[in-house]
A protein has these predicted regions:
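Conserved polymerase palm-domain catalytic core
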Residues: 21-25, 30, 37-195, 380, ...
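Right-hand nucleic-acid polymerase module
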Residues: 229-290
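Short, intrinsically disordered, charge-biased short linear motifs at domain edges
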Residues: 366-373, 397-403
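Histidine-centered nuclease catalytic patch
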Residues: 386-424
Length: 427
C-alpha cells in the first residue's frame, strides 16, 4: 500500500508534465480522453472523399513488459533513484520472486503514464518527415496521420508503398530506441474499403461513407458474457437475473451507441432473447411455450415480449423491473470529440472542460431536472471524497439525513460503500 501511495504521489507531479508533452492524437490513459475520441479521430480523417485509403495497424509486442529501463531513466523527468527502484523491484508470483530487467512496474498506477511518455514523440517524427509541400503551385499532402490509444495505434497514408517501405521501418526504429518491437504477424497494412478493427469498432468505407460499428469479435465476446450469466444462474430469481444482465447491457450499449449500431443492436437483442428463452425452458421443462411466455414476458407499452419481473421496493411498494433492449434503450448519440490541444491541467482550458462536463451530464441526466439541480447544488462534486461527479465514475442517488431533515445526495458508489463500511466498524 505504501508503494502504491508513493506512486500516486509522484504521478501527481508527473502527469501534468506528460500532458504538456503528449502527442495531441494520443487518447489512452489520459485525463478527459477516452476510446471514443480515438475512434472519432479515425472517422474524421478517413470520412472525406479525398481522405487516405491505406492504414498501417500497429501492434507492439508486450509493450508494458519490454520498455527499456535505460530509456526511461534517461528521459522521464522524475527522481532517478526512486524510478530505478520501481523499475528493478521485480514481482512475486506463486510466492516466488522474479526480477525485472525491462518493462514498467507490474500493476503500478504510474505504469500507464510511463508507457504513454515512452510512445509520445512518434506523431512529431511523422509530421516532420511528411509535411505538406507545394508542387507546381499546388499544395500536396501525403495524408500521414497517427491515432494512438495506449499501445494500439494506426497510421494512415495515401498509398501502400510509402507505408510499407518508409513509415513501417521508421516506426520500427522509433520503437527499437525504446526497447520495443513491432509484431510482424499483427502489424498489417489494410485498405479502408476492406475495413480494420480498432478499439472494438470495425471502421470501413462504403463509397464515400465511413461506418464505425462493433466488431464481430466484440459481439461474440459480449454474448459469451451474457450466456455465462444465464447458464450460471439457472435457479436465481428473474429480478436478480435482470439486474445482472442490465448492468452488462448498459455498459456495452453506452460504449457503442456513438457508432452505426442499429443492425448490431437488433442482432444482439435477438440473441439475448434466445438465451433467456433457453434459461426459462430449463427452469420449466414440463411447461408449454405459452405458459413460459406468460410467466416471464409481459405487455409493457405495447410490447408483449418484454422480459420483466415485479419486485418490492424498500418502502414496501410494488414496482416492475424490465430488461433493457439495446436497440430501443441506446439510440444513436452524436459524440463530441475532445480538441487535441486541450490540457486538463492548464487553467486556461478550465472553462472548456467545465462546459464539456456539463454537456455530458445533460445527456446523462436528460429528463431528470431534479438530479441536474442536485448536481449543480453540490458543486458537481461528491460530498465524501470531493472529486467530481461525472460520467467517468459510477455514482448514485443516496438518501441521507442532514440537520434532522431527509434529503438526497449524489455520491460515488465506491465512496458510499466505504462510508457504510466505516460506519459499521464504528458500531
Amino acid at each position: 500500500m505504501k508503494d502504491r501511495a508513493m506512486q500516486a504521489l509522484y504521478l501527481m507531479a508527473l502527469e501534468p508534465v506528460s500532458e504538456t508533452t503528449a502527442d495531441s492524437r494520443s487518447y489512452g490513459f489520459r485525463k478527459e480522453r477516452r476510446c471514443m475520441d480515438a475512434v472519432m479521430q479515425c472517422h474524421n480523417i478517413l470520412r472525406k472523399g479525398y481522405s487516405p485509403e491505406w492504414i498501417l495497424e500497429g501492434d507492439i509486442k508486450g509493450c508494458f513488459d519490454h520498455i527499456s529501463h535505460e530509456w526511461l531513466l534517461a528521459n522521464i523527468p522524475m527522481d532517478k533513484a526512486i524510478l530505478r527502484k520501481w523499475l528493478k523491484c521485480g514481482y512475486i508470483f506463486n510466492k516466488q520472486m522474479f526480477p525485472t530487467e525491462e518493462g514498467t512496474p507490474q500493476g503500478g498506477i504510474i505504469s500507464p503514464t510511463l508507457a504513454n511518455m515512452t510512445l509520445d514523440g512518434l506523431q512529431k517524427v511523422l509530421a516532420e518527415k511528411y509535411k505538406r509541400v507545394r508542387i507546381k503551385g499546388k499544395l500536396y499532402s501525403p495524408m500521414v496521420n497517427l491515432v494512438r490509444y495506449a499501445d494500439d495505434f494506426i497510421i494512415t497514408c495515401e498509398n501502400r508503398e510509402t507505408l510499407e517501405k518508409e513509415i513501417k521501418p521508421l516506426v520500427a526504429d522509433f520503437m527499437s530506441e525504446r526497447g520495443l518491437t513491432l509484431s510482424e504477424e499483427k502489424t498489417v497494412i489494410t485498405n479502408i474499403h476492406d475495413g480494420f478493427d480498432f478499439l472494438g469498432f470495425n471502421i470501413r468505407k462504403f463509397g464515400n461513407e465511413i461506418l464505425t460499428k462493433p466488431t464481430k469479435k466484440a459481439e461474440k465476446r459480449f454474448m459469451e458474457n451474457i450466456r455465462k450469466v444465464t447458464k450460471g444462474h439457472k435457479g436465481c430469481k428473474q429480478e436478480s437475473l435482470i439486474r445482472m444482465l442490465n448492468a452488462k447491457i448498459r455498459g456495452w450499449g453506452a460504449y457503442y451507441q456513438h457508432g452505426a449500431t442499429r443492425d448490431s443492436f437488433h442482432r444482439i437483442d435477438h440473441q439475448i432473447f434466445l438465451a433467456l428463452w433457453q434459461w426459462a425452458k430449463r427452469r420449466h421443462s414440463k411447461k408449454g411455450k405459452q405458459w413460459i411466455k406468460d410467466r416471464y414476458w409481459h405487455n409493457i407499452r405495447g410490447n408483449s415480449w418484454t422480459f420483466a419481473a415485479k419486485f418490492k421496493k424498500s418502502n414496501g411498494k410494488e414496482d416492475q423491473l424490465t430488461l433493457l433492449k439495446l436497440a430501443s434503450s441506446f439510440p444513436f448519440l452524436q459524440y463530441t470529440q475532445i480538441k487535441g490541444d486541450m490540457n486538463p491541467f492548464d487553467a486556461d482550458c478550465r472553462l472548456y472542460f467545465n462546459k464539456r462536463m456539463k454537456s455530458k451530464m445533460l445527456v446523462t441526466l436528460k429528463g431528470r431536472k431534479s438530479l441536474l439541480y442536485l448536481w449543480e447544488k453540490q458543486g458537481r462534486k461528491c460530498p465524501i471524497c470531493g472529486e467530481p461527479i461525472d460520467t467517468h465514475k459510477a455514482w448514485n442517488v443516496m438518501p441521507t439525513v442532514q440537520d434532522g431533515r431527509k434529503c438526497n445526495l449524489l455520491i460515488h458508489d465506491e465512496c458510499f460503500k466505504l462510508s457504510r463500511k466505516n460506519n459499521g466498524n464504528k458500531k
